Amino acid sequence: MDKLIKTISVSGAFRAYVLDCTETVRAAQERHHTLSSSTVALGRTLIANQILAANQKGDSKVTVKVIGDSSFGHIISVADTKGHVKGYIQNPGVDIKKTATGEVLVGPFMGQGHFVTITDYGTGNPYTSTTPLITGEIGEDLAYYLTESEQTPSAVGLNVLLDQEDKVKVAGGFMLQVLPEASDEEISRYEKRIQEMPAISSLLASENHIDALLAAIYGKEPYKRLAEEQLSFQCDCSRERFASALMSLPKADLLTMLNEDKGAEIVCQFCGTKYQFDQADLEVLINDKT
């Protein structure tokens, strides 16, 4: 089971989230049939989204849009405070040559663009924030967003490792944030540790990458585990929701589907689930509109 662990230093000056999102990203790959580079780009976005949602309370939802001018197209994901996330990539078929070590490159091919977040607090007035893509690596772009937009200095590491068949082997990451109580001396110690931290791919490849991430973040500094939350890829689409969407169409369009197409098929962008509406279903919808 995927999980996110919330921790805080005993001094109260730093907080860190560490995540195992392997099954979440694996589910996304299976649903969207993504090739290597698209899998990693989408996976990193899902992980980033789960970090942002974990910072919220109540029934809030956070949408992340990675909008670049590359062959990936847009990457969109939505996460809630219950650990659920869904998402898709506009072009699932990007398969860029890997490095000599088998690393899948994303940043150099993301292009120019923006990291957009939309936080819906359930009040009808969502808050939107946009920052430029700094590297296109997603993790560094999230760190820049947190530091610039939320005014919380942050370090973020995210990655998705693939096996020899380009299937998801492990996915996860971390976020470390400086809190107002931090002294200059503490900040210097943590900065040095983050700078000397092994590559995120190496930490994720560890036998127990959650413990490896925590050890890399805190070193010998004492910390407390505050909470452990379960994570999963879960879409909230439904036949009823898409029926309502059809009902919003002009009657003429529904008649065209009925008489010419003999039905309608709707595919959820976020999870790939297909919903069939036959002629009888469309007749009911048309009658309900009159």
Swiss-Prot record:
Q: What is its main location?
A: cytoplasm
Q: Which InterPro entries match?
A: Heat_shock_Hsp33 (IPR000397), Heat_shock_Hsp33_C (IPR016154), Heat_shock_Hsp33_N (IPR016153)
Write out the PTM section of this UniProt entry.
Answer: Under oxidizing conditions two disulfide bonds are formed involving the reactive cysteines. Under reducing conditions zinc is bound to the reactive cysteines and the protein is inactive.
Listed under GO biological process in this entry are:
protein refolding
Q: What is known about what this protein does? A: Redox regulated molecular chaperone. Protects both thermally unfolding and oxidatively damaged proteins from irreversible aggregation. Plays an important role in the bacterial defense system toward oxidative stress.
Family listed:
Belongs to the HSP33 family.
Q: What is this protein called?
A: 33 kDa chaperonin
Q: Which organism is it from?
A: Streptococcus equi subsp. zooepidemicus (strain MGCS10565)
User: What gene name is listed for this protein?
Assistant: hslO
